């Protein structure tokens, strides 16, 4: 598949607010990206017209009940069959921030045994509580399975911003060690919060900005085709988005977020 043939659906609902930036990141790299309200796809669209699906950040449905749950339930009810086909065909799905919450609520992540009928994890209220909007460091822990990071060297440190009030990744306490081991054994652990030298936060604030278990910032499914992360790569696409650009004498054209978009595009271009 040629780069210009890749067609990305950036799906939004009421409360989504990062759709334009996400589409622009794909456009910058020569890919077709269309922002579609979920109702447009229900009435006149075909999800299978797209090579890839993205759930961007925001506060879908006002984060009522809990973040992502209403969008996930609505999606399952209205487009459940199309989603099933999309997943079964191995087409990539990306969830950023609220999008990650949607994928977890839908049962697509972690997806130890495929799509789960109920959430296997949660992204809950930050600890300490409060909305966190700041730049953080991530370490790529994935060994190559995740299609969104397998062009990024294992151990590489990325600088990307967060903006969320409910980003604390947790497993059920009685199963957390077992589930963590499953993530590691199946190469489903992707990003962990760390300091600028790559040293794990070990739960310490502010390096771990939300109290996430095992400093988890992003995971993928067993096939590596579905990826969710709390940080916003679309907000680290260009040099001028970085907070300290005015104090530097030299800046590269792009930020670290570009690496994630480049990785999935590279993988899609290798498909027939």
Feature map (PLM): residue ranges:
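N-terminal beta1-alpha1 cap of cysteine-dependent amidohydrolase-like domains
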Residues: 1-96, 100-110, 115, 124-132, ...
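Amide-donor transfer/coupling interface in amidating biosynthetic enzymes
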Residues: 37-45, 83-85, 89, 118-272
């Amino acid at each position: 598949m040629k780069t210009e043939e890749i067609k990305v659906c950036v799906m939004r609902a009421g409360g989504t607010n990062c759709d334009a930036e996400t589409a622009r990141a794909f456009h910058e790299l020569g890919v077709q990206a269309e922002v579609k309200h979920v109702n447009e796809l229900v009435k006149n669209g075909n999800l299978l017209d797209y090579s890839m699906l993205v759930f961007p950040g925001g506060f879908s449905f006002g984060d009522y009940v809990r973040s992502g749950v209403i969008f996930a339930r609505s999606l399952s009810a209205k487009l459940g069959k199309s989603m099933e086909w999309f997943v079964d065909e191995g087409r990539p799905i990306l969830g950023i921030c609220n999008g990650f919450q949607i994928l977890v609520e839908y049962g697509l992540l972690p997806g130890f045994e495929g799509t789960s009928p109920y959430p296997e994890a949660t992204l809950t209220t930050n600890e300490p509580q409060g909305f966190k909007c700041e730049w953080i460091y991530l370490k790529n822990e994935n060994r190559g399975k995740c299609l969104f990071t397998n062009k990024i060297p294992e151990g590489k440190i990325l600088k990307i911003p967060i903006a969320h009030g409910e980003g604390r990744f947790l497993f059920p306490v009685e199963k957390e060690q077992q589930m963590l081991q499953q993530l590691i054994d199946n190469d489903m652990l992707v990003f962990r919060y760390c300091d600028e030298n790559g040293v794990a936060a070990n739960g310490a604030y502010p390096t771990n900005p939300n109290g996430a278990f095992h400093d988890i910032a992003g995971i993928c499914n067993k096939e590596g085709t579905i990826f969710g992360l709390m940080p916003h790569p679309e907000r680290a696409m260009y040099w001028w988005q970085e907070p300290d650009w005015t104090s530097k004498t030299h800046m590269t054209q792009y930020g670290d977020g570009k690496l994630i978009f480049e990785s999935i595009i590279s993988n899609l271009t290798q498909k027939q």
